[in-house]
């Protein structure tokens, strides 16, 4: 089977981009050798006609080629089974049909067998056209005239150019004789066996090797049946040309009448040789002439001769009529062919001259044009060694090139006698052979000798001559049939003799080349002895000579190193040597890199294995089949005896988690993995009750397996599968942590005994905190402060203090899963201490030092009974509890910022403050307003007043300042009814504190100034437009924002404005400026020390001031009372002092967090001190997690006499969010955002 997968034709021309690719032209014929399964690049070989032509192999894109068209069909007329090259030739039988793809070479057709579907070559004379219409005889002239597609180059040594000369005229007698002989046509029936196959190129190397340049030089085998040939021919043609006589080989023509055989047809023709030319003149057709160097192959078999020419290509099979004529033609062609070789003639010429010779010892590369490139072992003639001692002019014996060579690179040869004798012997042999007739009898068999024997053992080699007679052997193009004669010794033809050198350069012999077979070179020495030398023993130069003569490739016998090669082109040889050396270095470098990579990978793998084993030894216990168990146990947190602890450890090690998972219904494939995870985490059997979903998920269990395990555990321990809300979920203002709507519901109690004060120790009320989870952002109930009850009442006395001493209701404990806050961390400022209560008006006995109550959770809706005769006291929700006392006709100002109005009759809702409950006292008939922030109140329809709050004023007593934002006007409210909740520009809602108080004007007494924001107001000293007027006393300053207030008369107190400069036109004024908020300080009876700063340190003007651990400035309670001044973010703090010394100090910073909406936060602290020292710290934290929050804050403190000291806060605690901010009682009604309107934004 051949190696050809198909015959293709190039559709487009392609230029190679890499050395592995093949250059093709359009319509080139290609043999497909290999198809690629990865890409579209196929390996092909280009068809080239000619014996010396190389058929290149390479890659071409499959889209550039297509299957070659079929030219015709032929049928086999003989069987062909003995193939010469099984890789390219097909075996077939008679009557097999073939598709012909190429018939340019008439001797070998490129076909496809229709029987076996194989591609390859078949002999052209073994087939005929299938239809029989076209004969080979008619196709022969066309085939003869068709030139080769790529003619093979002539031997490099051939220098004779062909010239077109007509054949010489013939004598009349010769012409008549030839004409008479031509009439005698040979009998076709006498040719029994099939015709011999023509000589064609053969490739000795593998066709699949892409790097090897296969030279197709297929030569027919020469067969001989026995030593004695049959001398009886069909006809005997005796020509006068047989007796050539003495003549010059290049001056006289030799002519023979021959018969050309094409298939089964025979045509008469004439063959002439002379003047270095060969003429073939057919009887019918065009004559052809070739120079002797165009003859690439010639061979004979009995009476048949095979000639192959190039330029133009033609393969001839001639029938000479008898074997003698055939041998004569072969001898003459051999002489002409040998004489035409320039290297042979040059060797004879050089040998005839007496020149100084030398042998090259080292390689030398020419660097200039006048230098000569030589290699070690080359033989040179020393032309001039006198001109320079260092550089000699030398000439290569082989190529004839001359140039300068370093003298130390050449070793001269001193034996001149041997050279002269050799030259004289060659000349004598040439003269002797020229006198002999060209037709000589030669032995047909080839001599065989021992390849390892020395060339000098001629007698030993001559004894074995003729021992292989009778065997069929393949002959080269220069081999001829000879008859062995033991009586006489033949001598070689001096024209064909040359000097042969072995590979080591030790032995040299002058001999004629006979042939090459089975890896041996047959030579005929000058002394007549025939020897056979192994091809691998000869030098590369001699092997190249044999390749040129025979057309066979002997690459496998050549030496690998380029040191001994003596090619005609030394530069190409040196380049090839360097290329091979570079490739070898690259291969070696790649090999080292691969070895290094393998070593590094091996080392890394070893380190990884060591680390893995170390981790396994560290984490896992020794493996006990079938499953690993843990040798260490979880540290026992309970105090058990050592023996019991060891027993527990042993039992935990023995627990079979694999069986546990099987009982849970887990798949067997996952049980082992879960078991390993449990053992690695050192889980024991006593930990089963603590296993939960998150733990199982962390240990790598699947969701379905988690459900199975938890069901098994619940069933095992008798637990109910109750879904609990995650403890770390957080809600917002309107929704619960589970996503449901936030409904303010609280359990109602009907037992008044639960409102009584209860004696509880701080240790009993403080729950244990858990540090396992960080629940800083979790919604928690209000903190419980540790109350220090100074007096314990067991029965009612009938005073207001009894109500204030009541203990709030404690709601039921939540589930155990709900974390309890740490009361120590949430401890607010204590409200007990030096607080001096006011004297009650009623005659009921009142406690002289009422103790503040502990705060309670905002979730309760606890109420206290309140008689209608009492006046409500204000509840401060943002600061500390201050007992308030009526000193005169003052009405304590009220600040309404979305507050809850209180009903004076009926029950008074107990309100939750930031730090405790404010004890209420009444010293007069005036009503103390209550201030609440964001608390739920009775239904108050919202009323839009144009962006401001309606101030509340009283008709008697001094009017305390009203605080409003962006007030544009005042609207009187109806009396005796609830105050409508009003929509302001900042979203602040005013509340009615018990009675409707319309805005009136104060005609006597002192009027507390009014503070407004965003309104420009002017005081002219007389009547005030849209403002309360003071006609009998000094007027307090007015503070506005974004306006420049002007005071034109009277005693003016300092005014503070934003983005404006205060102007003072009369009186003494102490300006106080504040950036980011207004701080107004009024002092009517003493000196005032204002201090305005942000994040500044407080000043202590009297006594010491220790620093607390939470960054608060502690104040001394004696002497001048320092007043901590808060830092506001968009509000104002007004401090009014009517007597005594008031010192304001910087309070702690207020932190505001707004994460999901718009927050407007206004803070205002108004302090009135009429006679004494007051110290008031304030700290406010606001958290808004979702939605819109408007949080105004205002703290009003009234101190009419005596010393009042409020303790410092110790910690900044988180307060619950939601409506009311945890500072007021929650209502039982529910907010519905879908019912929201402009006047009812929360949809109550």
Curated annotation (Swiss-Prot):
<feature type="repeat" description="4">
    <location>
        <begin position="923"/>
        <end position="929"/>
    </location>
</feature>
<feature type="region of interest" description="Disordered">
    <location>
        <begin position="415"/>
        <end position="497"/>
    </location>
</feature>
<feature type="modified residue" description="Phosphoserine">
    <location>
        <position position="454"/>
    </location>
</feature>
<feature type="repeat" description="7">
    <location>
        <begin position="1020"/>
        <end position="1026"/>
    </location>
</feature>
<feature type="repeat" description="11">
    <location>
        <begin position="1084"/>
        <end position="1090"/>
    </location>
</feature>
<feature type="modified residue" description="Phosphothreonine">
    <location>
        <position position="858"/>
    </location>
</feature>
<feature type="region of interest" description="Disordered">
    <location>
        <begin position="558"/>
        <end position="592"/>
    </location>
</feature>
<feature type="modified residue" description="Phosphoserine">
    <location>
        <position position="447"/>
    </location>
</feature>
<dbReference type="GO" id="GO:0005886">
    <property type="term" value="C:plasma membrane"/>
</dbReference>
<keyword id="KW-0472">Membrane</keyword>
<dbReference type="GO" id="GO:0005634">
    <property type="term" value="C:nucleus"/>
</dbReference>
<feature type="modified residue" description="Phosphothreonine">
    <location>
        <position position="1075"/>
    </location>
</feature>
<dbReference type="InterPro" id="IPR035821">
    <property type="entry name" value="Sla1_SH3_3"/>
</dbReference>
<dbReference type="GO" id="GO:0043332">
    <property type="term" value="C:mating projection tip"/>
</dbReference>
<feature type="repeat" description="9">
    <location>
        <begin position="1048"/>
        <end position="1054"/>
    </location>
</feature>
<keyword id="KW-0009">Actin-binding</keyword>
<feature type="repeat" description="16">
    <location>
        <begin position="1200"/>
        <end position="1206"/>
    </location>
</feature>
<dbReference type="GO" id="GO:1990964">
    <property type="term" value="C:actin cytoskeleton-regulatory complex"/>
</dbReference>
<keyword id="KW-0597">Phosphoprotein</keyword>
<feature type="compositionally biased region" description="Basic and acidic residues">
    <location>
        <begin position="171"/>
        <end position="184"/>
    </location>
</feature>
<dbReference type="InterPro" id="IPR007131">
    <property type="entry name" value="SHD1"/>
</dbReference>
<feature type="modified residue" description="Phosphothreonine">
    <location>
        <position position="984"/>
    </location>
</feature>
<feature type="compositionally biased region" description="Basic and acidic residues">
    <location>
        <begin position="610"/>
        <end position="621"/>
    </location>
</feature>
<keyword id="KW-0963">Cytoplasm</keyword>
<feature type="modified residue" description="Phosphoserine">
    <location>
        <position position="996"/>
    </location>
</feature>
<feature type="region of interest" description="Disordered">
    <location>
        <begin position="610"/>
        <end position="649"/>
    </location>
</feature>
<feature type="repeat" description="8">
    <location>
        <begin position="1031"/>
        <end position="1037"/>
    </location>
</feature>
<feature type="cross-link" description="Glycyl lysine isopeptide (Lys-Gly) (interchain with G-Cter in ubiquitin)">
    <location>
        <position position="471"/>
    </location>
</feature>
<feature type="compositionally biased region" description="Acidic residues">
    <location>
        <begin position="226"/>
        <end position="235"/>
    </location>
</feature>
<comment type="function">
    <text>Component of the PAN1 actin cytoskeleton-regulatory complex required for the internalization of endosomes during actin-coupled endocytosis. The complex links the site of endocytosis to the cell membrane-associated actin cytoskeleton. Mediates uptake of external molecules and vacuolar degradation of plasma membrane proteins. Plays a role in the proper organization of the cell membrane-associated actin cytoskeleton and promotes its destabilization.</text>
</comment>
<keyword id="KW-0728">SH3 domain</keyword>
<keyword id="KW-0206">Cytoskeleton</keyword>
<feature type="domain" description="SH3 1">
    <location>
        <begin position="3"/>
        <end position="68"/>
    </location>
</feature>
<feature type="region of interest" description="16 X 7 AA approximate repeats of T-G-G-A-M-M-P">
    <location>
        <begin position="868"/>
        <end position="1205"/>
    </location>
</feature>
<dbReference type="GO" id="GO:0034316">
    <property type="term" value="P:negative regulation of Arp2/3 complex-mediated actin nucleation"/>
</dbReference>
<dbReference type="GO" id="GO:0140224">
    <property type="term" value="C:SLAC complex"/>
</dbReference>
<comment type="subunit">
    <text>Component of the PAN1 actin cytoskeleton-regulatory complex. Interacts with ABP1, KRE6, LAS17, LSB5, RSP5, RVS167, VPS1 and YSC84.</text>
</comment>
<feature type="modified residue" description="Phosphothreonine">
    <location>
        <position position="831"/>
    </location>
</feature>
<dbReference type="GO" id="GO:0000147">
    <property type="term" value="P:actin cortical patch assembly"/>
</dbReference>
<feature type="repeat" description="5">
    <location>
        <begin position="945"/>
        <end position="951"/>
    </location>
</feature>
<feature type="modified residue" description="Phosphoserine">
    <location>
        <position position="449"/>
    </location>
</feature>
<dbReference type="GO" id="GO:0042802">
    <property type="term" value="F:identical protein binding"/>
</dbReference>
């Amino acid at each position: 089977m051949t190696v050809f997968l198909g015959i293709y034709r190039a559709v487009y021309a392609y230029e190679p981009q890499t050395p592995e690719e093949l250059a093709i032209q359009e319509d080139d014929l290609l043999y497909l050798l290999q198809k690629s399964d990865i890409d579209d690049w196929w390996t092909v070989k280009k068809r080239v006609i000619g014996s010396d032509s190389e058929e290149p192999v390479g890659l071409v894109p499959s889209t550039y080629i297509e299957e070659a068209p079929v030219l015709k069909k032929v049928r086999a007329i003989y069987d062909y089974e003995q193939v010469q090259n099984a890789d390219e030739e097909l075996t077939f039988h008679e009557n097999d049909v073939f598709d012909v793809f190429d018939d340019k070479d008439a001797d070998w057709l490129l076909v496809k067998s229709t029987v076996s579907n194989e591609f390859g070559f078949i002999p052209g004379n073994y087939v005929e056209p299938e239809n029989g219409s076209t004969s080979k005889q008619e196709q022969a002239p066309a085939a003869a005239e068709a030139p080769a597609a790529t003619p093979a180059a002539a031997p490099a040594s051939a220098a004779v150019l062909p010239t077109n000369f007509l054949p010489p005229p013939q004598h009349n007698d010769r012409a008549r004789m030839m004409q008479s002989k031509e009439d005698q046509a040979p009998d076709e029936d006498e040719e029994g066996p099939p015709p011999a196959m023509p000589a064609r190129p053969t490739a000795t190397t593998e066709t699949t090797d892409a790097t090897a340049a296969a030279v197709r030089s297929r030569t027919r085998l020469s067969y001989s049946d026995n030593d004695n040939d049959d001398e009886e021919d069909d006809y005997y043609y005796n020509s006068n040309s047989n007796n050539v006589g003495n003549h010059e080989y290049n001056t006289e023509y030799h002519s023979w009448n021959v018969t050309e055989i094409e298939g089964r047809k025979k045509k008469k023709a004439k063959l002439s040789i002379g003047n270095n030319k060969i003429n073939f003149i057919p009887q019918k057709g065009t004559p052809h002439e070739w120079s002797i160097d165009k003859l690439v192959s010639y061979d004979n078999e009995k009476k048949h001769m095979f000639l192959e020419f190039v330029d133009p290509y033609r393969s001839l099979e001639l029938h000479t009529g008898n074997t003698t004529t055939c041998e004569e033609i072969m001898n003459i062609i051999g002489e002409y062919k040998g004489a035409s070789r320039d290297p042979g003639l040059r060797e004879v010429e050089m040998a005839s001259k007496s020149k100084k010779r030398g042998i090259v010892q080292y390689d030398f590369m020419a660097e200039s044009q006048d230098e000569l490139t030589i290699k070690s072992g080359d033989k040179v003639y020393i032309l001039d060694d006198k001109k320079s001692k260092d550089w000699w002019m030398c000439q290569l014996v082989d190529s004839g090139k001359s140039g300068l060579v370093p003298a130390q690179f050449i070793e001269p040869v001193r034996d001149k006698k041997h050279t002269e004798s050799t030259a004289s012997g060659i000349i004598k042999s040439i003269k002797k052979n020229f006198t002999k007739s060209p037709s000589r009898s030669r032995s047909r068999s080839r001599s065989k000798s021992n390849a390892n024997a020395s060339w000098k053992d001629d007698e030993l080699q001559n004894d074995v001559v003729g021992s292989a007679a009778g065997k069929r052997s393949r002959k080269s193009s220069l081999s001829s049939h000879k008859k062995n004669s033991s009586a006489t010794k033949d001598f070689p033809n001096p024209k064909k003799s040359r000097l042969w050198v072995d590979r080591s350069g030790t032995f040299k012999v002058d001999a004629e080349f006979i042939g090459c077979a089975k890896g041996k070179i047959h030579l005929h020495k000058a002394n007549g002895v025939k020897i056979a030398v192994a091809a691998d023993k000869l030098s590369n130069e001699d092997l190249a000579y044999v390749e040129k003569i025979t057309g066979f490739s002997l690459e496998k016998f050549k030496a690998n190193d380029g040191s001994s090669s003596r090619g005609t082109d030394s530069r190409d040889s040196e380049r090839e040597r360097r290329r091979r050396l570079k490739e070898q270095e690259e291969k070696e470098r790649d090999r080292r890199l691969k070895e290094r990579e393998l070593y590094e990978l091996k080392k890394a793998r070893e380190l990884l294995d060591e680390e893995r084993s170390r981790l396994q030894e560290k984490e896992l216990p020794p493996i006990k089949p079938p499953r690993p168990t843990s040798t260490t146990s979880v540290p026992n947190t309970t105090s058990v005896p050592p023996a019991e602890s060891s027993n527990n450890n042993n039992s935990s090690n023995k627990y079979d988690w694999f069986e546990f998972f099987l009982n849970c219904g887990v798949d067997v494939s996952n049980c082992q993995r879960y078991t390993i995870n449990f053992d690695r985490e050192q889980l024991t059997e006593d930990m089963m009750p603590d296993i939960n979903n998150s733990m199982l998920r962390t240990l790598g269990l699947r969701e379905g397996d988690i459900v199975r395990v938890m069901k098994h555990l619940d069933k095992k321990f008798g637990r109910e599968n109750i879904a609990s809300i995650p403890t770390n979920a957080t809600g917002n203002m309107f929704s619960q942590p589970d996503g449901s709507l936030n409904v303010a519901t609280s359990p109602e109690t009907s037992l008044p005994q639960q409102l009584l004060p209860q004696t509880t120790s701080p240790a009993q009320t403080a729950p244990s905190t858990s540090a396992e989870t960080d629940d800083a952002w979790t919604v928690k109930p209000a903190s419980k402060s540790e109350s220090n009850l100074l007096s314990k009442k067991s029965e009612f006395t009938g005073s207001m203090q009894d109500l204030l001493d009541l203990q709030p209701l404690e709601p039921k404990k939540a589930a155990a899963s709900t974390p309890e806050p740490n009361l120590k961390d949430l401890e607010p400022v204590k409200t007990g201490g030096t607080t001096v209560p006011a004297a009650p008006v009623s005659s009921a006995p009142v406690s002289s030092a009422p103790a503040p109550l502990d705060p309670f959770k905002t979730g309760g809706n606890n109420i206290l009974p309140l008689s209608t005769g009492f006046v409500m006291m204000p509840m401060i929700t943002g600061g500390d509890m201050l007992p308030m006392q009526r000193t005169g006709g003052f009405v304590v100002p009220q600040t309404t910022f979305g507050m809850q109005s209180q009903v004076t009759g009926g029950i008074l809702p107990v309100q939750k403050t930031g730090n405790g409950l404010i004890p209420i006292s009444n010293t007069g008939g005036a009503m103390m307003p209550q201030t609440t922030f964001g608390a739920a109140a009775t239904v108050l329809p919202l009323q839009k007043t144009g962006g401001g709050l309606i101030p509340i004023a009283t008709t008697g007593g001094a009017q305390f300042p009203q605080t409003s934002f962006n007030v544009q006007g005042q609207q009187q409210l109806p009396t005796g009814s609830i105050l409508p909740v009003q929509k302001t520009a900042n979203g602040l809602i005013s509340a009615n504190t018990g009675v409707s108080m319309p805005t009136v004007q104060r005609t006597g007494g002192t009027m507390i100034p009014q503070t407004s924001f965003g309104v420009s107001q002017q005081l002219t000293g007389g009547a005030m437009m849209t403002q309360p007027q003071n006609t009998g006393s000094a007027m307090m300053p007015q503070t506005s924002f974004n306006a420049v207030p002007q005071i034109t008369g009277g005693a003016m107190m300092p005014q503070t404005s934003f983005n404006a400069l205060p102007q003072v036109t009369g009186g003494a004024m102490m300006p106080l400026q504040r950036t980011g908020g207004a701080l107004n300080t009024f002092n009517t009876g003493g000196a005032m020390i204002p201090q305005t700063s942000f994040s500044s340190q407080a000043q202590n003007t009297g006594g010491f001031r220790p620093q607390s651990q939470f960054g608060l400035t502690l104040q001394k309670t004696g002497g001048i009372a320092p007043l901590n001044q808060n830092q506001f973010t968009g509000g104002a703090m007004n401090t009014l002092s009517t007597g005594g010394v008031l010192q304001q100090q910087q309070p702690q910073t207020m932190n505001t967090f707004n994460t999901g909406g718009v927050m407007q936060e206004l803070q205002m602290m108004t302090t009135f001190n009429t006679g004494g020292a007051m110290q008031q710290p304030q700290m406010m934290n606001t958290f808004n997690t979702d939605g819109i929050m408007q949080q105004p804050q205002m703290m009003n403190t009234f101190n009419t006499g005596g010393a009042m000291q409020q303790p410092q806060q110790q910690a900044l605690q988180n307060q619950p969010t939601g409506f009311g901010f945890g500072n007021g009682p929650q209502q039982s009604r529910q907010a519905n955002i879908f019912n929201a309107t402009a006047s009812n934004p929360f949809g109550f």
